[in-house]
Swiss-Prot record:
SUPFAM superfamilies per record: N-terminal nucleophile aminohydrolases (Ntn hydrolases)
A Gene Ontology biological process term: proteolysis involved in protein catabolic process
Keyword tags: Allosteric enzyme, Cytoplasm, Hydrolase, Metal-binding, Protease, Sodium, Threonine protease
Protein name per the record: ATP-dependent protease subunit HslV
Residues noted as binding Na(+) in the record, renumbered to the chain: G162, C165, T168
EC number: 3.4.25.2
Quaternary structure, from the entry: A double ring-shaped homohexamer of HslV is capped on each side by a ring-shaped HslU homohexamer. The assembly of the HslU/HslV complex is dependent on binding of ATP.
Entry's family note: Belongs to the peptidase T1B family. HslV subfamily.
Lineage summary: Bacteria, Pseudomonadati, Pseudomonadota, Gammaproteobacteria, Chromatiales
Localization per record: Cytoplasm
First-listed, main subcellular location of the protein, grouped into a coarse class: cytoplasm
Name of encoding gene: hslV
Gene3D superfamilies: Glutamine Phosphoribosylpyrophosphate, subunit 1, domain 1 (3.60.20.10)
Pfam families: Proteasome (PF00227)
NCBIfam families listed in its UniProt record: ATP_dep_HslV (TIGR03692), PRK05456.1 (NF003964)
Length: 184
């Protein structure tokens, strides 16, 4: 059976703003099933952003588990991420889930994997998914050579990834913290 492919998620932090965005394409084999999927959401009373790459049903399960950890640990992002990673790695059912989560608040960006990894980026951006390397390269170039805010860097870098990666499109959703008046 063919598997669902593709997604690009990018998080960028600059000057007190964090932006997390993703494309909208869902692909099965060589066929685009949907072009406007929403892979980014707000959690914990709107104070945490999360995006996923991988199997959609698996990601929703992980969103629920992560939000439960956020509630349990009063919104502490790093502690909640570590606890989810431990649960994800040790639980026989969760271990089979195929997704990556990128989570962020205004202080931290983290990627969580099913192998128990909780990764904080070296620079103020993090990208995952099939177009992740393209979005990361574009985002880093924009971060280092322009004064654009985080949300505009995220939007533009994801558009560039959508132009290069066949599993990524230009239907971009960007969420920001703190919230801006005009969301992409």
């Amino acid at each position: 059976m063919e598997t669902l492919h593709g997604t690009t998620i990018l998080a960028v932090r600059r000057e007190g703003q964090v932006a997390l965005g993703g494309d909208g394409q869902v692909t099965l084999g060589h066929t685009v099933l949907k072009g406007n999927a929403r892979k980014v959401r707000r959690l914990y009373h709107g104070r945490v952003l999360a995006g996923f790459a991988g199997a959609t049903a698996d990601a929703f399960t992980l969103f629920e588990r992560f939000e439960a950890q956020l509630e349990k640990h009063h919104g502490q992002l790093a502690r909640s991420a570590v606890e989810l990673a431990k649960e994800w790695r040790s639980d026989r059912v969760l271990r089979r889930l195929e997704a990556l989560l990128v989570v962020a608040n205004t202080e931290s960006l983290l990627t969580l994997s099913g192998t128990g990894d909780v990764i904080e980026p070296e620079h103020d951006l993090m990208a995952v998914g099939s177009g992740g390397p393209y979005a990361q390269a574009a985002g880093r170039a924009l971060l280092e050579s322009t004064d654009l805010p985080a949300d505009q860097i995220t939007q533009r870098a994801l558009e560039i990834a959508g132009d290069i990666c066949v599993y990524t499109n230009r239907h971009i959703t960007v969420e920001t913290l703190p919230e801006t008046r005009e969301e992409s």
